[in-house]
Each structure stands twice: as structure tokens, then as C-alpha cells.
Amino acid sequence: MRRIDFRFAELRANGRKALIPFITAGDPSLEATVPVMHALVRAGADVIELGVPFSDPMADGPTIQRSSERALGRGAGLAYVLEAVHEFRREDAATPVVLMGYLNPIEIHGTRRFAEAAVAAGVDGLLLVDLPPEEADETRAIFTEVGLALIALASPTTSEQRLDMLCSTAQGYLYYVSFAGVTGASNLLDTYAASDRLRQLRQRAGAPVVAGFGIKDAASAAAMAVDADGVVVGSALVAALAEADDVRSARERAEAFLAPLRQALDQA
């Protein structure tokens, strides 16, 4: 959790926006995950969101659903994800890593047992898509005790009452879903409406606010970053990596995809 706080403080001091790429652990191959993570850092990633493959990813569009299915088919379970983070930490002790996933695998593992294992591996935070904020107190308490940030999600349909709760309990950063839908549906991105909401959230939240869903290239990243503390890019990157033939190709594709977004954010 401290790595996340330090990174955003550093970015704020330098007047820069956070670039947060999302990849699915185990896709395009088990061997490629860690090399791709390092490649993303070289290309300008400030935080990495690592997707935990799940059999029923309800918030994800077809691109990430297929990616998750491929990863599960290769055996990329929770143990693999934590081992990948542990391996990444052998060379990178600074870049925050946030896991994005669903409750079921965590509950099967045992929340406290998982949280302790995640921190030991080098994980900084967790974003649980299907954990309602009204039911998050126990999980948040366990995570806070061991040093994990519980990243919250807000969307255009989030009620004011729930927003108040999210803003007052936000840890690490608040992830604003720029439209009500599934990941990858970039045609639904409404920059103007999202920007207005982002400005409001940044005034209310006790943590940085980042925007995701629908960001697919340098132009959309720069546009959304104007009123956010950072942007998350997922489906478009996952789609680019899916075409990789080997680890080297995956690394090259990761850097080639992300570098223009970094440049656009720094020039915005």
C-alpha cells in the first residue's frame, strides 16, 4: 500500500499523470507475464494492474474474458499469480502492483491467509469487482492490518450515498469506471460526462482518482487524464498481447503499445 501512496505523491509533485496498464496473469503465456510487467515499466507504467484469471468475469468484455479463459487453461490460478508478483519483485521493488479480480478465489483461499500471502509476494493492493462497499468492512480491516490497499470502484450509476462511502474509505486510489458497461466497450466512452464526474470525485475523495474502461490509445488516454490523476488501459493492451507468438514478441508488443500513451500523458 505504501508503494501506491509514494508513487502518487511522486507523480503529483512532478505534475504527472499515472499510467496504469492492466494485463491478465498467464496470458499470452505463463512465461510471458513477468517479462511483460518489466516491459510495461520500461515503457512508462507507474502502477501495474494484474488480472487474476476467473471463470466468470462478469465485469469484463469479450477480450478480457477470452484472455482469462486462455490463462485458466494454462493453469494460471491464484498461486501462479502470487508467484509471478514474487518473481517481479526480485528486480523491481518500486513499482506498485494491484491485483484485479473477484471474491470467490479469495474466499476459497481464506481472506486473511490470502492477504498475508499477497503481501509476502509483494502485492500492494486489490480491486475486487464483486465486493459491494457496504459489505467490505471486514475485508478492508484485514487488508489494512497486513498492508494491502482495497481499491474501490465507482461508476456513472453509483448512488450519492455509496459515493460518499467510497470517497471516505478510499485506499490507494479510487477507480472510476467511465461508463456503465463492461471492459473494452470503447464506443461508449463519453469524455465530457466522465470529466465532469472526475472533477467532482477528486474534490471529494481522500485518495487519487483514476479513470478506466474505454481507454484504448494515446488520444483517449490524454483526453481522460485531463481531469483524473491517472488512467487505466486494459482491453486494448490485452488484445495486442494476444497476438504475441513468444515472450520476446510479448515484451515488444507491450512496450510498443504503452510508450505512445506515456508520451501523450506527459505532453498533455
UniProtKB/Swiss-Prot annotation:
Metabolic or biological pathway: Amino-acid biosynthesis; L-tryptophan biosynthesis; L-tryptophan from chorismate: step 5/5
Full protein name: Tryptophan synthase alpha chain
UniProt keyword list: Amino-acid biosynthesis, Aromatic amino acid biosynthesis, Lyase, Tryptophan biosynthesis
Superkingdom of origin: Bacteria
Record-linked InterPro entries: Aldolase_TIM, RibuloseP-bd_barrel, Trp_synthase_alpha_AS, Trp_synthase_suA
EC code: 4.2.1.20
Name of the gene encoding the protein in the UniProt record: trpA
Native source organism of the sequence: Xanthomonas oryzae pv. oryzae (strain PXO99A)
Task performed by this protein: The alpha subunit is responsible for the aldol cleavage of indoleglycerol phosphate to indole and glyceraldehyde 3-phosphate.
